[in-house]
Structure formats: structure tokens, C-alpha cells
């Protein structure tokens, strides 16, 4: 993960590739790969099918309508993702990788 930590209005956040111009936005973009098939995750429908096969279920009790959430009955883990797939950044990808070791990998898109 590369970027700059920004502190603004009492909140600290990581801004990935802050000096990157708009012309070459995909050169450093990350993708998540499902290792058993080598498939790049390109939509939430694909991701949800895979997560379900790994024992994850949709969680509707969070109250936040801007999030897709998944939980696993056998653990206390919760995966929270933005509903808009275009906002599915490497932070969310790594969260999934950590909670599903040996099934996913994050790499550069190129």
C-alpha cells in the first residue's frame, strides 16, 4: 500500500497515489484475484458467489444502507464493502484477503 496519510477535520485517512494524474489512472490500480480459478474479481455479483461458497452470508443488521456486509457464522469477522463497486479499493481487498487466507490475492492491474 502506498500513498499519503492525510489528517483533516479530526480524521486521518490514507490517500493512495495522491500525485497521480488522471491520464494514467489504471497503472497503479489494484485488482483482487480468486486464487483457485485465477479469476479477477470484476463485480460484486462474482465476489458474492465466491464468498457464499466460502461460507459467508449477507448481513443486513448493520443499518448502513451504503454498505454491503457479509458475516461468517463460524467467526466474529464482518466484511463491509461500499455498495458502489467503483469505490472497491485495495483497503477492502486486503480486508477480504486477511479474512480468507489462501483464496484471494491482491496485485497490480498491469
Swiss-Prot record:
GO biological process terms held by the UniProt record: regulation of flower development
Similarity annotation: Belongs to the FPF1 family.
Entry function: Modulates the competence to flowering of apical meristems.
UniProt protein name: Flowering-promoting factor 1
Organism (species): Sinapis alba
Lineage: Eukaryota, Viridiplantae, Streptophyta, Embryophyta, Tracheophyta
